[in-house]
Design a protein with these regions (language model features):
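Hydrophobic core of alpha-helical transmembrane segments in multi-pass integral membrane proteins
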Residues: 11-20, 37-38, 67, 144-152, ...
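Multi-pass membrane catalytic core of lipid/isoprenoid biosynthesis enzymes
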Residues: 1-35, 123-162
């Protein structure tokens, strides 16, 4: 009963703050986003959690939306000028949004593999139950390769433009490349681990590693901002 009370209070608080922000940016219809989030989380707990992929996609989308809201509320209402740094910042936010979605999606599927025994008891229709551990593991390996190659593409462009064309060997650029390499290294560890995971403990480790990757990725936002401003 106490949990339900707190659930309602926090939902009302979040909705109230969301409506306030929507009116502050003079886009009152943006408040529908927060209504959608509340309804989606309720629907997830009732039905989506046991449905095939729908719950995984929903949680991933809501996680990514939390990052995209920065652009949605701060940049889009004023218009994005393609002739200055605003458009570049918008593209960076889109990259972070995509990163949050794919890592959360991977983690949600791994959690389903970890909880497979319990999900079978409640007749859940998860990817792991429908296709088995072996096929699901191959799907996850493929999904991990998406951010790995995405980061590799960014590293290539950063190295070519900053170090070989502009000959800009600044500490800021070096730290940026090294930090991104750390994220890629963690993704490769996840890739190797998932390629041979079979036990519940393996899936627990991989799920926890996804959390670490997400945290390291999010921490890069204030770090890169500080490096650019100083």
């Amino acid at each position: 009963r106490n949990a339900i009370t707190w659930y309602i209070l926090f939902n009302l608080l979040g909705l109230g703050l969301g409506i306030y922000i929507a009116y502050a940016v003079k886009k009152p219809y943006f408040s529908l986003i927060f209504i959608y989030c509340i309804f989606s989380l309720w629907a997830y707990s009732k039905r989506m959690k046991t449905s095939f992929l729908l719950g995984n996609v929903q949680v991933s989308f809501l996680t990514a939306l939390a990052i995209f809201n920065v652009a949605l509320f701060d940049m889009i209402p004023n218009g994005i000028n393609k002739t200055n740094n605003e458009f570049m910042i918008f593209k960076i936010i889109l990259c972070y949004t995509a990163f949050a979605f794919i890592i959360t999606f991977i983690r949600e599927i791994i959690k389903d593999m970890e909880d497979m025994e319990g999900d079978q008891k409640i007749n859940a229709n998860t990817l792991a139950i429908k296709y088995g551990i072996e096929k699901t593991r191959k799907i996850i390996v493929f999904l991990i390769l998406i951010p790995v190659f995405g980061i590799a593409y960014f590293q290539y462009n950063a190295l070519i433009s900053n170090f070989f064309v502009e000959l800009n060997y600044s500490m800021e650029n070096l730290i940026t490349v090294l930090y991104i390499s750390l994220i890629q290294f963690l993704l490769i560890i996840l890739l190797v681990k998932m390629n041979k995971s079979n036990k519940k403990s393996d899936f627990y480790f991989s799920s926890s590693l996804c959390k670490v990757i997400m945290i390291v990725g999010i921490l890069s936002i204030p770090l890169f901002t500080y490096l650019q401003l100083n």
